Amino acid sequence: MQFMTVDLFDNERDGFTSVRIPALVALGGGKLLAFAVGRTQVSDWSESKILMRRSEDMGLTWSPARVVAEMAGSVVDNPVPIVDKERACIHLLYQTDYKRCFYTKSTDGGETFAPPADITATFEQYRPRYSWTVIAPGPGHSIVLRSGRLLVPVWMAAGIGKAHRPSCIATIYSDDGGATWQPGEIVHDNDDFLPNPSETVAVELSDGRVMLNIRNESSRYRRAVAYSPDGATRWTPVEFADALYEPICCAGLVRMGPDEGADAGVLVFTNPAGKPGEVPRSGKGMPRTNLTVRLSYDEGRTWPFSRSIEPELAGYSDVAAGDGFIYCLYEHGAGSDKPIHPRGIRLARFTVDWVKERE
């Protein structure tokens, strides 16, 4: 079967006002972990907890949803899972109340997670350079570099109260398997060229450089990119990726692994690509419609193949690859009178050949 979908999280079924913020990792051997955030209200600031479901048959069947991170009365959000094959573990980062960041890990394939460690001190080291009031990792999966470094894109805001703007982006990293975390350089701060950069995804390129693919609020409505030799320092000036439309929304990005045969090294990107004639909704953002997958065979310089996964309402997405398939976990439908709030989270499974066939 070249294309299939399954609904993994549902607002009503799972007992939440809103289920959002997908994160997805492929462990190999047909095993997948899908994360989401269950919220008591639709607001980013509502009480919430991180949910997870597990598949052992390439996404055909799934375990019941269970809570993997919670804190009574608090926001618990922005799951960032990392598959670390060398250390045989899954790392997980998340934030609480947009002011603390936690790290935990699983050494049994996601069956259990260690007690979380507060790593907010890593963000405190930014204060001489950036006086943040809001912090968040990811969201979505992140990566282990070939050097063994764990790398997580983060965003911070220095607004008044709970404001998520103005914002900047950076990375944090660990060179000791998650035991300690260090702050990288600030990649880009809010300015007229690239207003309010925020939710960012990372990929390691074939030459060892790290590329960040950046959400932003530019009126050009295009994704932005920046490059670093180590994922933490010497970032290039940000530039626009003209081939990648930006409705102002979180996106997914993954590099297909060495076990994927002729498709090894292909970059896979997912986000809402929009429809002709759409105009901005309230604020600057464009409607989140027509979730589309794109393939690049030249390290993200061009994206010659694309296909729509979900033609109607679809928001945040994350993407994983393994076992000959691409997996995309994404917000779909409308769960309230505001289309930005989805009805649930769906998984699509498909092949590279399916993308190349187009519609």
Predicted regions and their residues:
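Asp-box/BNR beta-propeller blade signature and adjacent active/binding-site loops
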Residues: 1-359
